[in-house]
Amino acid sequence: MQKTKKTMAGLLAATVLLGATSVLQAIQIEPVSAASDPVKIMAMGDSITHGYINGDNGYRKYFCYDLQQNGITNFDMVGPNNNWSDSATYDWNGTTITYDPAHAGYSGYAIQKIGSRQGLQETIFDTTYVNGDVSGNMMEAYQPDVIMLQIGTNDVLDAQLTGIGDRLEELVDK
């Protein structure tokens, strides 16, 4: 049973990531003028967004690098978590890449609080949230222009499939 749950979670995550890649490839993004305000992007989700597995900030560094390689440099990754740094680096093919590590990823989180899992929806919209001089719900505090959402893996791992679509729709509609 445990192996089946892990396999299903892996397939779901792969499907979501492949779907996101296809969508990104279909969207034509024009480079933003340096004179305009940076586009605020919030990577939001569970441990996959947090970068927990390798402890290396996960997919976010590759996302930032791909934007830069496509001429999109006027963006700001926003969120309450930054893995203890305002900038981060990684080495790729002998090149040191610098990227913005800010995000709203939380290891172990489900779409909504369910069982012993904390819920992303409750955390994001918690009006008692305080981080330094930023307070209020995260959407108001950071005002992202773009949200990248990767959530639901822990719902699948815990076999909390009943209502998963409704929970996700409720989060997205907020």
Task: Walk through the language-model features, giving the residues of each.
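Sec-dependent signal peptide cleavage junction
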Residues: 18-36
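Nucleotide donor/acceptor-binding cores
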Residues: 37-39, 52
